[in-house]
């Protein structure tokens, strides 16, 4: 009898310990909400300050403007696609190949390029990587020259396609264009991720992910998506590439491309392409959780007027009337609450049994 009693106590203890780490107390893990420092407040590093301000001499300060004295690239706005550089103790614009330069233009052509006829061009005219080429251009391997991307040409990498396309089987295919239940070849960018679809890694077809927007604890709770901290201090399921459900994302990326062409911008920056850069930044903010849930950048994105109803980003019902993810979320929440109540009652009962066994 004594052995049976000990076994019952041990089993009950193990069960209670497992319950204490489960969903009964709300499995959605709490995330820390950070308090950012404003200009003039004491700091230890730039991550303590509101973006894009920096920490210098233990004080939050604005980034240094072009032409002002500096000590590091960070002071000049390193975050702007590395275009702000501290050159010989003065902040300057590090121009890319294809950018306007010379008289009437700020900045210095970057390493490996020179200013000719008011344009930054490669020293010997040859490129060695795609990153040296202007927007919508790639480094052609046979000629080592920057060539414009042409839709319809064969490709062997994504950079040979427009930014709105990816290279799939030597052909440029429009991103996010595959419908539900159609093949995606294991490439997540082919499925309509902004509409709630994901590329099933096993079957390699586009499938609806009804976990979008639901609370989570680990990535495994999100199907093919990932679990991230949101702005409310909780974890939430988003797409595998941190994508959010939002019906304006495709329009945003197309607007950005049109702007880059209309303004003849060669690189994406707030200094050399000031009209298009906010469109790009707002696209990233509205469509990707990695930016939308970045607490440090919250004030920065508000200054760009990127704010959107958060509900439309995390609630599929708001983004797509035909998507039933929202109702599934409510159903799952009710089921979760019911399970939690049951487990709490069970744990209390087991606790009472343990007390009685110990006493008697």
Swiss-Prot record:
It is found in: Membrane. It is a single-pass type I membrane protein. Its main location: membrane. Residues 317-336 are annotated as: Disordered. It comes from the Eukaryota. A zinc finger (C3H1-type) spans 114-140. Glycans are attached at residues 126, 241. GO terms for molecular function: co-receptor binding; receptor antagonist activity; zinc ion binding. This is Uncharacterized protein DDB_G0272420. It comes from Dictyostelium discoideum.
